[in-house]
Amino acid sequence: MKKIALSLVALGLLTSLPGLAATPAPVPTAIASHDGPIRIAVIRNLGSDDNTTQFVAGAIQEGKKLGFKVSTFLSNGDDAKFQDFVNQAISQKYDGIILSQGRDPYSTALVKKAVDAGIKVSVFDTAVNGEIPGVTVTQQDDASLTNLSFGQLAKDFNGKANIVKLWVAGFPPMERRQAAYKELQKQYPEIKELESIGAVS
């Protein structure tokens, strides 16, 4: 009798679970009624390092799941090429543009130009000044990354070490890391920077 009661409870739970499952969100009208595939341009101002490879692969994979056609463009740190890619995406009337690693002073104007053309824009680690309505702006917490890694270095070497810094100026995440790094140098004067090296490739 106990087995039958347990089986009925289990069956009851299993049959009620579909009713508790979250119903999928409705597809936005703009997407559902779109003529042809939705075209997204992913434009990144870095080379094809491991991080970029993962970033681009993730964008393509997610786009595919949504039925989007995703095109990717890498400018290898060449600001003129990056701007050209963005302008081409605007003139080719992409439905959406994802920008990564755009720099000052040009990124804000490019984002506004795309929005004015009716293109949805999302930016990651891109220098955008002020709020632009409808634009999604995201960035990683570079100060925390710096504090964690530098803090571990200070702990491992009792606050005394000679280091080589890998850094490239001008990219928003690198600039945020540099600001945190300068503060940490004041706290740990016995950690000496012997050299700073880095290039975008």
Language-model regions, residue ranges each:
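Bacterial N-terminal signal peptides that target proteins for export
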Residues: 1-8
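Bacterial N-terminal signal peptides
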Residues: 8-16
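A residue-level marker of the well-folded mature domains of exported/periplasmic proteins
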Residues: 3, 21-201
